[in-house]
Structure formats: structure tokens, C-alpha cells
A protein has these predicted regions:
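Bacterial N-terminal signal peptides
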Residues: 8-16
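A short, solvent-exposed beta-edge/loop patch
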Residues: 24-33, 37, 47-49, 87, ...
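Charge-rich, low-complexity N-terminal segments
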Residues: 23-83
Length: 188
């Protein structure tokens, strides 16, 4: 019986990676096929997992590209951008940065492909439930909520969650939120 892992999905994703990184992904996938053909299922699985991890890291870096630059008077400190960083929440990818200005600071976090996004999806895709959290607003066709604490939460295309939390004024958080390429993020 053949092992139940999605080698096809990993191979398809490998076609989307950059050439330099693709070599390492291709090497891992070729090693997986060699091990599989030799009957070493454990090694085949390990190599497929390694290739999937590399692809996840590339995707996490892509997610980090949606973090906005700091506005005038603010600085941006790079945070964590990684795959599987949300182990306690079922894995997934995360990208975040901390923004610091005279009025305080805030952390902007993008999360995708994890159980927390799925769990929050029911709440953030329902306007009535969003209203119970705070003030519901729109950026184009995208709804988001400004919580009573002055934080911002949004769910993009039911797949990517944006959270902005911290001591900065809500106006600064909202201005940075509006700099995010929401249409591009919906296609991520």
C-alpha cells in the first residue's frame, strides 16, 4: 500500500518557488522519490515533509511582503515571519512587525492556514458578531472591526487574519491597516 501523503501537492507547489530555493526543494523531492522507490517509506516521508517545510517558509516570506511600510513619524521593527510558528494553534504561517511612534506602538500580525483563522472566521465573517466586538468599518469591500480596546481585526477572503494590537492611537493603527494591499492579500 502506498503512503498517504500529498506528493502531488508538494510537487505542484515546488513549481511556484524561486529558482535558487527550487533547487533545495527539488533535491528534497528527488530524494523522497528515490527513498520511496527503494522502499524506505520513513525517509521518503521525511524528505517530503522537508520539502513542504521549505515551501511553507517561502510562502511565509510572501505573506511578510504584505506588511506595510511605516508611515512618516513611525518606524517598523521586523518580527517573526515563518511557517509553522503557530504550533499551539495548529500550525500555519505568520508574519508580523512592530510599529513604534511618538504616540505608542502596535504589532501588526498576519496569520494564514491555521486553526485559529478558521475558528475566528465564523466571528469575523458575520457582521452582527463583529458588531458585538466593537465598531464595524469598511475599506473598499473589506469589513474590519475596531474593538472597544482600539485594536483592529479583519478576515481577508476567509483565509488570512489581520490583527493590530497595542498602545498606539487607533487612528495610527487604522492608517497602517489601510496601507495593506487587501486585494493582493485576498489572492495570497
Amino acid at each position: 500500500m502506498r503512503p498517504n501523503f500529498s506528493l502531488t501537492a508538494v510537487l505542484a507547489a515546488a513549481l511556484l518557488v524561486t529558482p535558487a530555493a527550487a533547487d533545495e526543494v527539488e533535491d528534497a523531492l528527488e530524494a523522497a522519490l528515490e527513498a520511496y522507490r527503494a522502499g524506505d517509506i520513513a525517509l521518503a516521508r521525511e524528505e517530503v515533509d522537508f520539502a513542504a517545510t521549505l515551501i511553507g517558509q517561502m510562502k511565509a516570506e510572501g505573506l511578510g511582503g504584505f506588511l506595510p511600510e511605516a508611515m512618516a513619524g513611525w518606524t517598523r521593527e521586523e518580527g517573526d515571519t515563518s511557517a509553522q510558528a503557530l504550533g499551539a494553534f495548529g500550525g500555519g504561517i505568520v508574519a508580523n512587525a512592530t510599529y513604534v511612534g511618538a504616540g505608542g506602538s502596535f504589532e501588526l500580525t498576519l496569520m494564514a492556514e491555521n486553526q485559529m483563522v478558521a475558528a475566528m472566521g465564523a466571528m469575523l465573517s458575520n457582521t452582527a458578531l463583529m458588531g458585538s466586538m466593537g465598531t464595524v468599518k469598511r475599506a473598499g469591500r473589506q469589513r474590519y472591526v475596531v474593538t472597544r480596546e482600539g485594536d483592529i481585526q479583519a478576515l481577508i477572503n476567509n483565509r488570512v487574519m489581520i490583527q493590530i494590537t497595542g498602545s498606539a492611537p487607533v487612528e495610527a493603527k487604522e492608517a497602517h491597516f489601510l496601507l495593506i494591499d487587501l486585494a493582493g492579500l485576498a489572492e495570497f
